[in-house]
A protein has these predicted regions:
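RNA pseudouridine synthases
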Residues: 1-323
Length: 323
């Protein structure tokens, strides 16, 4: 059994956990850490060891500790400088089992890469005082809408299983060009492949592994609002399928560009957000079997306020980094 971290969360983040290998050429645990963590300067590792910031199961690691195989170590990572995302995470529902939120555009679900503190998970752990909170699923950083979190670690599996067993019904809304020549409603099926380390997913020949139902809800002035119902959960599936119909989602700097290449500003420019919203989430309660349904309160500005969307978003909160 994996031991529990002796370090409490900090800034809403769990400590990093490492397990040393069965053997190796290192004389000391410090030597192993220097080799294991190439992105951390050796001087920083020395400072962390001297300050007792790297711990094992019996306490802080001594800087001269001999290498030991199959040993667990914990430490808190240094936080990168992140521009605050000035948009609020709205709580739709909170009970002793789950937290359901309305995630804004531009906020990642979980810490990853350059986005650590400025994520929905870390914000909610800090703001709600829930150190074991974890997501049952994820939304892309640029997608807004309904996102489900589980309050306790021992209940996470029950909710994640609902998603893996396809017992969760999700609908999305998108704003894209209106083309009366595209027959709707329709079901799009294709094969989507996402390679590790490559930003864009691709549609390739072969047996379909992705399926989306596309319906037209309303249109005006050349733009339309669509309901998208994914029957599978491939990376960037909805964006690829809309592009394949000749209806790229507005604000899509990855799949909506004329060149087919992502724009340089795609990761950092908060103007003109992707017009994709996780609108509803419906699932059977794992305890009672009762159907639970949650709906986003957000709207897609490119349809409701085209001029405002073109001008860019207005920040709606101040973000603090206090513990």
């Amino acid at each position: 059994m994996t031991p529990v971290s002796p370090l409490p969360p900090r800034h809403g983040l769990d400590a990093v956990r490492l397990r040393t290998p069965d053997d190796g050429p290192w004389t000391t645990m410090r030597d192993h850490l220097v080799a294991r963590l190439p992105r951390v300067a050796p001087a920083r590792i020395d400072a962390m060891l001297a300050g007792g910031l790297i711990v094992g199961r019996t306490g802080p690691l001594d800087p001269a500790e001999p290498f030991r195989p199959r040993e667990f170590l914990w430490f808190h990572r240094d936080l990168p400088d992140e521009p605050p995302v000035p948009f609020a995470v709205d709580v739709l529902h909170h009970d002793d089992e789950i937290v359901v939120v309305d995630k804004p555009h531009f906020l990642a679900t979980i810490p990853r890469g350059r986005h650590i503190v400025e994520t929905a998970l870390v914000r909610l752990r800090r703001e709600l005082g829930l150190p074991e909170l974890s997501p049952a699923h994820r939304l892309d950083r640029v997608t807004a809408g309904v996102l489900l979190f589980v309050v306790r670690r021992d209940r996470r599996g029950a909710y994640q299983t609902l998603f893996s067993n396809r017992r969760v019904h999700k609908t999305y809304e998108a704003v894209a060009p209106h083309d009366p020549a595209v027959p709707l409603p329709t079901t799009v099926r294709s094969r989507i492949v996402k390679e590790r380390g490559v930003i864009l997913a691709r549609e390739l020949p072969g047996p379909p592994n992705a399926e989306t139902r596309v319906e037209l809800l309303e249109h005006r002035d050349g733009a339309a609002r669509y309901r998208l119902t994914p029957l599978t959960g491939r990376t960037h599936q909805l964006r690829l399928h809309m592009r394949g119909l000749g209806l790229p989602i507005l604000g899509d700097r990855f799949y909506g560009t004329a060149t087919g290449e992502p724009e340089d500003s795609a990761l950092d420019d908060w103007t003109r957000p992707l017009q994709l919203l996780a609108a509803t989430l419906e699932f059977p309660d794992p305890r009672t079997g009762t159907t639970r349904r949650f709906a986003s309160r957000r709207t897609l500005q490119a349809f409701t306020d085209p001029a405002g969307w073109a001008a860019g978003p207005t920040p709606d909160r101040e973000v603090s980094r206090s513990a």
